[in-house]
Structures are given as structure tokens and as C-alpha cells.
């Protein structure tokens, strides 16, 4: 399959005919209740008027394996274009975040610059040409953890961009809840921000596409807070979409963001609504799942099935895929920011397409679903799929260029301010990263300003969204770190909090990196200068953190002593599975984490004496 995959068809059970039709969404049809009426689930669950985008969409790609050419009248090829984890990256991402790895015929790899919605729009519009039956869908995390251009304005620019891209439907992801369900309601429905007001004279109209959240329930009513599914229809062709986010969303989002919500099992939820769609006569179904896996190769065009069908991928999506009913024809996934096109067997033992398009708009997936008008089902033997690179060698879409320029005009006075200087790229890759060390040091320095007794700082790796790039992104000059670049690194506006812990609790926190909910996928905290220990990956569970090796400024941690620890507010609430961090005492809440980083860079660097990348040698890793 490099870049493409096909697999055989296995028919589903018969369904009842459908009657509902979709017209293009109007502003009067609001999918999600406003903040004041969040609990009014009946309104949230109201059917959304719908009508597929009828744009004369088209291809422009080399065909993959499988059903080719013009199908007989019985069959209709439906193009499904999909992407995931955009995270508000409207401008081309910089550094490694703006590149993909491509496997060459001789086994070598090369990197390709990719991403930017001006280019994504051009690629999608070109792909749609000649395909009158075309759907564009997404797998969640369209917003949240966004660069300044979008994040400064609560991601209104990204919603506007997705409207221009003619996105038809998306699942929610965990980052859609960063600012809570009320803010998600506003992004869906429109309206000015309740605190910051309107950014433009015309106001904000909200998303033209539905967000789906079948497994996100209002705890009071037990019903989904958003539409659980949506059906695309055109000339008798009907394809249903069910959207879910990962069940573990509350573990990786601030408690305030998911207050009053319950997140249910992904596969069980999809299976439930597949039956609902079956009763409506919808036999062709695609699941949009904001959960993913880890392919065996980082190359976007790696043949995931080369070791054997489904053998080239691991992670949560494998178990989910094996438990999602055979009624579902394809799975569009995300969350792990990986690229893959894999076949994973459904519960009946039949292969089914599972795809993901990396992140940040660097790729999109082009899937062909061949619809059998006689059965109303997808002929799985004809399903083909390929990840396509959003290269930057095509013309920019003028409407997206105008959109970016308009929002940049508003953001520039804040974003262009220099906050520091670096001598080289400072990456956020690896178990311990140079940038992770820098941020932890910044939080320790800020903590000492609040309380001179502060001993150490801990930073969650998921809160570091990008590296710092030496090369200038604009006119600021090489080595200059702007506020916008800092915002891209730390966009969540978490506060820096101080808490007291016993030495025994500090040891327990370090062990929670590799045990409990983090046992299968460790979350290695970034640590401040002076804290050292050994991580032995040849062992299992909590034993991977070697207790006797844990030292602060060269001295062993005293289990009975009290240590003052700086963390961000997400960790201080026990996020990412660090339950012990939620048990601290003597809380002191400081400024936001980006301000702490900016102050540290300003105080410790200049054009003549830039900061060098830290050595990232505080954790000794045994493999």
C-alpha cells in the first residue's frame, strides 16, 4: 500500500430506508445550546438541516489500488477527504512541525515542507475537481493549542478558515474542550466572546459544519451534548458519520473544561449509533474517532500492512477498531498526530480502512468509498485510501490569504514583540527535551520570585506544543523569539502554581510518569535544573524510575521533608494521570506560564548573548 490501501467487501445487515434530507446549514439552525442553556439537551439533539456541499469537487491524484475508472450505474464512487488535529495552524508551521517524512523507493527517506491552510485549500479544491460526490470530514482537535494568530482570538479565525475549506463535518477532540463546553457551543453557534467581546464589526457567525460528540454526555441528563451523528445525502446516496472523542479526555483536559460532562467508551458508543442509523436506513457509515495509534514508521507513505494486515500499527485505535461493529465501513482517526493508512480487522475478521493524516494540516487523506445503490452499502473491496502531502509548491488560495492577513493585522502589535534570543533551534522532542528543560527552569525561576523556598519545577510534555526555531519566521531576524512564537509553544494560559509535597510524594509523582494510566504510554515530566534521576526502561511499571537515583542538587530526596514545587495549573489539578500532584498543600497561584517563560527569556538572553539549547541531561535513560 505505500500511500494507498484496499481491502475486500463484506456486506452488512439490511437496513430500513431513510427519509431525512440535509440542506445547507442556516444560521437559524443552531446545533449546540448556548452557555445559558447547556443542560437543555433536547435542543442540543435536534436534527440539523443538512445538504452536502455540491461544489463539483474533483481529483487530480494518481489512483490507488482497488476499484478504478467509471463505475457502472449501480455503483457510485464517493470521495472522502479528511484531516485531523489542525490545532489552529493557519500559517505554515515552522521547524519540524511543518515537515513530513517521505519514504523513497530505495528505502531512504526525505523531508518535505508541508502545511498552511492557504495551500490546504488549494489542494482540497483541486482534489474535488471531477468528483461531484465529495465529502470533507475531520477527526477533531481543529482548535485548541493553537498558534497566536488563532489562539489569541479564541480560535474564531480557524472556524472561519474551516468554513472557507468547506468542511462538512468533524468529531470533537479533547482540545475542543480546552475552554469548556460553553465556548465550544459558541464556536458552533456564533456570537461574541463573553469576556473579550467581538473582534470584528461583523461579529462571529460560528461554524457552518456540525461538530459531533456521540460519547460526550451531560451528566444531568445522560444525553449527548452535541449531535451524535450526521447523514450526508445526494441523489439517493446516503453515508452516515458518527463522531466521538477519546474516553480519556477528562484525564488530559483541565477539570473546568469538562465539568458536568461524562465521556463514554468509543466503540460502544459508535456501535449504539450505528444501530440507530441502521433503523433510519443508512447502511454506509464512517466513524470519526479522535483517538489514534502509532505506526511502525514515521513516513507518511509507509505501507502499514507490509508486515501483515494491521501489523504496522499499535496503540488504542487498534483495540477500538477491532470492537467497532462491521456496520461501520471506515474509521477516520486522530489525536496521536501520526500518519497512517491501515487495514485492521473488524469483529467479523474482515479488514477495514483506518486512516490518520498526521497534524497541523500537513496532510489530507483521500479515500474512495464505492457506494452500491442496490444495497445502500459500501463495497469494501473497492475502498482505497492514500495520504497526500499539502505541499507548498502550489498557488495560495486567495480567500485564505486574505483571511490570514486580516487576523494578522489584529494580532501583529502583540505577536511581533521580541521576548528573547536563542543561538540555535531548541527542540521539544525526546523523553527529556531541551525546550522542556528551559520551560521548567523558567517556572522554577518564577516560582522563586513568588517564594524563595521553591525547590523544583515540573512541566508536562503535552503542554509544550512546538519547538523554538532559530530561523526567522517573519521580519524579526534569526534567533529572535517573538511573543507569537512563545504563544505557539505554550498556548493554554495555564497559571504557574506553587504547592508543598513531602519527599515521598515527589518520588510518587515521578513514578506516576510510568505507572497507572501512564504505564502503557509514559508521560515523562520535564524537570528543572538540579533534579536528576535514572529512568530504566528495561524494567516495568513504577520500577522504571530508580528510587535511589532521585536527587535534588546532588542530595537524595528525603521522604519526610517538605519540598515546594512549581507546576502549571493543569498538573496542579492532577492532570495527565498525576493524581499525587492534586494533593499538594499551601497553594499559591501565580501568573500564566507564557508570561513566566517570556520573563525568563528576557532576563537571561540578549542579541549579544542568546540562550543556547539546554543539554537535556537531567534524566539518565537506560534502554
Residue ranges and their predicted role:
Residues 43-71:
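C-terminal region of N-terminal signal peptides and the immediate post-cleavage residues
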Residues 413-432:
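Glycine-rich phosphate/diphosphate-binding loops and the adjacent beta-loop-alpha structural elements
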Residues 74-79, 83, 89, 99, ...:
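Feature captures C-terminal
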Residues 293-298, 412, 428-429:
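N-terminal leader/propeptide and maturation segments of large enzyme subunits in energy/redox metabolism
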Residues 2, 53, 69-389, 438-445, ...:
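Acidic, metal/ion-coordinating pockets
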Residues 1-53:
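Secretory targeting and sorting signals
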Residues 382-395, 551-554:
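Short, solvent-exposed aromatic-acidic interface loops
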Residues 399-416:
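Acidic, glycine-rich low-complexity/disordered segments
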